[in-house]
Amino acid sequence: MAASNQNHLPPGLLESVCTIESNLNPTAIHHHDGNGDSLGICQIKYNTAKSLGFKGTEKDLMDPKTNIKYAAKYLAHQIHRYHGNIQKGLIAYNQGSAKDLTRSKYSDKVIKVYQRRLIACQDYTM
């Protein structure tokens, strides 16, 4: 994914996030009570994307390329915020400004999918 490269994310990490967030469904919407909806393939919130410079509408954010672009920015921001700690960055991506950055089921799921992708890539290149 170009967005991963542009944001210096490890190859396959953002795809693993999207797999857990929406099962790679670009039309996924998860409604939250009073906290904005999570939208699209990466399940990013509209206000989060706006805070990263997004100027479009919620409908525009449903475009997979746009959704991935802003999700990559947000994930990279969270990982950088926690000094390169991928697990803490994943927890913060999922929970917002996370207060408790201990291991979570969410980050464990993403890491497991990510590890499977890495193993599959290694098997393919051998």
Regions found by a protein language model. Name each.
Residues 1-126:
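Catalytic glycan-binding domains that act on GlcNAc-containing polysaccharides
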